Regions:
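A short coil-to-beta-strand element that immediately follows conserved catalytic motifs
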Residues: 44-54
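Nudix hydrolase/Nudix homology domain
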Residues: 15-17, 53-55, 62-130
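Conserved Nudix-box catalytic region and its N-terminal flanking loop in Nudix hydrolases
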Residues: 1-40
Length: 130
């Protein structure tokens, strides 16, 4: 999983490690269109990225109340992640993540999403066609 520090300008969990991309849907925008817009803004030269919807869940705390839609993207070439907007970002193994879970190192949302992401990635890797 590629993770990096959340910007200090974020409403939630400033500076904590999280999945690096998020956006709000525009009025009338579909989930797919929003995910594609986010990817094309983040990776303007990579037109072959296909987001795959995995889960939606309700997230609420003292600061926000939102519905989260989580997508994953398979990348053959991770060099596109070497971008200044992902400063400090890196690929994490499950073992590295699990070592830091529950220590307030990751964002609250990521802590909730992790087990689901781990299962989805494991299944996708198991049945990946080479």
């Amino acid at each position: 999983l590629f993770l990096c520090n959340r910007p200090q300008s974020c409403i939630l969990d400033k500076g904590k490690v999280d999945i690096p991309m998020e956006c709000y849907l525009r009025y009338g925008e579909t989930l797919t269109a929003g995910a594609n817009r986010l990817l094309s803004n983040a990776f303007p030269k990579a037109s072959d990225l296909k987001p795959t919807f995995t889960i939606s869940y309700h997230f609420e705390n003292e600061q926000t109340n939102r519905l989260v839609y989580l997508f994953i993207v398979d990348m053959e070439d991770d060099s596109i992640l070497c971008d200044p907007r992902f400063k400090g970002g890196k690929l994490w193994t499950f073992q590295q993540i699990e070592h830091n879970l529950g220590t307030h190192f990751f964002s609250e949302c990521f802590e909730l999403e992790y087990e689901h992401l781990k299962q989805v990635i494991g299944i996708r890797e198991k049945y990946k066609v080479s």
